[in-house]
Amino acid sequence: MRALSQDYYIALCTELIEHDRRYYVLDRPTISDYSYDMKMRELQKIEAQHPEWKVPWSPTIYLGDRPSGQFPVVPHSHPMVSIANVYSLEELEEFFSRTEKLLGYFPTYSLELKIDGIAVAIRYENRTFAQALSRGNGVKGEDITANVSTIRSLPMTLPQDAPEEVEVRGEVFLSYQAFEKLNICQREQGKLEFANPRNAAGGTLKLLSSREAAKRNLDLSIYGLITNREEHSHFENLGLCAHWGFPIAGMPKQCRTKEEVIERIREVEGMRSRLPMAIDGVVVKVDSVAEQHRLGLTSKHYRWAIAYKYAPERAETILQDITVQVGKTGILTPVAELTPVLLSGSRVSRASLYNEDEIEKKDIRIGDSVYVEKGGEIIPKIVGINLAKRSPDSKPWKMPSLCPMCHNPVIKERVSVRCTNPLCLGGMLEKICFFASKGALNIDHLGEKVIAKLFEMGLIRSCSDVFALTENDLKQVPGFKDRSVHNLLASIAGAKEVTLDRFLTALSIPFVGSSGAIALADHFGTLDKVMKASLDELLSIEGIGQKVAASIIDFFSKTENVEEICRMQELGVRILPKQVDRWAPLQGKIFVLTGTLQEMTRLQAEERIRSLGGKISSSVSKNTYAVVVGREAGSKLKKAQELGVQVLEESDLLKILNQN
């Protein structure tokens, strides 16, 4: 049993805010909706028990979506709040009781499929499509008109019997078929695949190119008409929308009793696996618009609607084998190879096993009949074992003592197992993929699939080999024509001039990510100084601790790493030294950002501070110049106050940036 404390409460708030960021901003959630909702309920329960602990930035107060900073933010005509979730018939009964108590009678309900997509508000002027907004924070949303206009099922004009001004609410989604085609395209281009259709739809709506958005075949289902007229029911309004040409994929149905509601929920669950798009439940709405207006809404949810959510889809299949992959830093990761099974609209044949300890903890064995579930990740996970089907001859699985790629010994490091060979081919393939990726050197046309082909043909075996590729080499690659060869060689040539921080990131130094690389570049200015840095010099840098400093020294002490860097330079790679403008207005001043900014993203703020000579740190110390606080500022604000460090509101930071 976890001990309940205020520190745990704060940690839970922080965790949920991070999950909100991954879900709404990055479109790459790492937990399932069910897991998120269970954590949110735990938070609500703690706040009910300890109201004195409740912080003003609690995720129970605000509505999720944050602006990406790429599109104009526009106020909604009517609040666009979310719908509360329930996971059991008992909780649904509580909703019925609350509603009946407020109205004085049991109302008629309208039920619709809860399509797993992105909510949008769509407005028409003079019966012509005028604007589309994302949900945003419920009060304001981003203007995504250009991308929504690419949806083929969206009518551009309405018939003459429609009002001149119309606003509808709907869900933008990708069908399973469109999602599968999109991920095939992503794989072929060496790009990261989307975890699920919802993430893909969200990512598409945030594309800056509507031409690219059009290629992805988004779809739309309208679920509401904004109206003050109360003579029609919600169900009738959806009928009007259908008459005007709007797509209604939610299969609405009126239910006049609890029994009818429950029967419909079970009916939809039975057809769930046969639907062409992802759904995660059924939305239950009070059908009368007049009754909806009487019931109103809270700061986060409508009182007249509830979403009955189904448990995450899971499937049972056979664990045929456990293979081991080698990552870019040499870490061995076990992967479950499964008998292919259909799950959430796609065929699943692999599942994540994380590490040896996880396998041992769950006692997962080859040959087991296992339950797999898809959460927020591309690769599903094993959530259980059908022990009744386990063979009496099965044996516990053990991590190999030799690397499966190079057959050198491996060593155990806490929970991970690492190959001891720095030149391991498995690790090198992953290292080259990262080296060329968007987060490192960003070499266009050199995706994972192309790198795998080059590696398989023996044309590359190290990162420096990328810069040695010739026209004749590339013409040997199957499917590579003159234009492909020209484009890739041009991209490689362009990558030969690289900033110090990006080059350091691309080297895959253990424990050194992009922020650590920026800190090193800011402090030392040149690669030569970084390579010769002492432990004390490294430890003096804000954000560099003992573990990271030791890793940097170890990396540059190895002959093979130094030789690799020298070869790159011989092949024409020019590492641009960090230019230090000693007259820059924020030169040397350390900033810490905490909370959510409203006028710009955190990344944009960090870039602007760095452009004026400032530095970014993740922790507050006596050396911090200022802590910039946004919405839901956390423990860093408290630490700044304790140390007497200057605290700036976002408006204060904007004044400083705009003045310079």
UniProtKB/Swiss-Prot annotation:
EC assignment:
6.5.1.2
Give the enzyme class: ligase
Give me any GO biological process, just one.
DNA repair
Q: Which InterPro entries is this protein grouped with?
A: BRCT_dom (IPR001357), BRCT_dom_sf (IPR036420), DisA/LigA_HHH (IPR041663), DNA_ligase (IPR001679), DNA_ligase_AS (IPR018239), DNA_ligase_CS (IPR033136), DNAligase_adenylation (IPR013839), DNAligase_N (IPR013840)
UniProt binding sites for Zn(2+): C403, C406, C419, C424
Q: Which cofactor does it need?
A: Mg(2+); Mn(2+)
What GO cellular component is one of the record's annotations? cytosol
In its keyword annotation, does this UniProt entry include Metal-binding?
Answer: yes
> Which residue range or ranges hold the BRCT domain?
581-660
Q: Please list the residues that make up the active site.
A: K114 (n6-amp-lysine intermediate)
Alphabetized, the UniProt keywords read: DNA damage, DNA repair, DNA replication, Ligase, Magnesium, Manganese, Metal-binding, NAD, Zinc
Pfam families registered for this protein in UniProt: BRCT, DNA_ligase_aden, DNA_ligase_OB, HHH_2
Q: A GO molecular-function term, please?
A: DNA ligase (NAD+) activity
Q: Does the keyword DNA repair apply?
A: yes
Which reaction equation describes what this protein catalyses?
NAD(+) + (deoxyribonucleotide)n-3'-hydroxyl + 5'-phospho-(deoxyribonucleotide)m = (deoxyribonucleotide)n+m + AMP + beta-nicotinamide D-nucleotide
Q: Which residues bind NAD(+)?
A: D33, Y34, S35, Y36, D37, S82, I83, E112, R135, E171, K285, K309
Superkingdom in the source lineage: Bacteria
Q: What role does this protein play?
A: DNA ligase that catalyzes the formation of phosphodiester linkages between 5'-phosphoryl and 3'-hydroxyl groups in double-stranded DNA using NAD as a coenzyme and as the energy source for the reaction. It is essential for DNA replication and repair of damaged DNA.
Q: Give the UniProt family note.
A: Belongs to the NAD-dependent DNA ligase family. LigA subfamily.
Q: What is this protein called?
A: DNA ligase
| Phylogenetic placement of the source organism | Bacteria, Pseudomonadati, Chlamydiota, Chlamydiia, Chlamydiales
Name of the coding gene: ligA
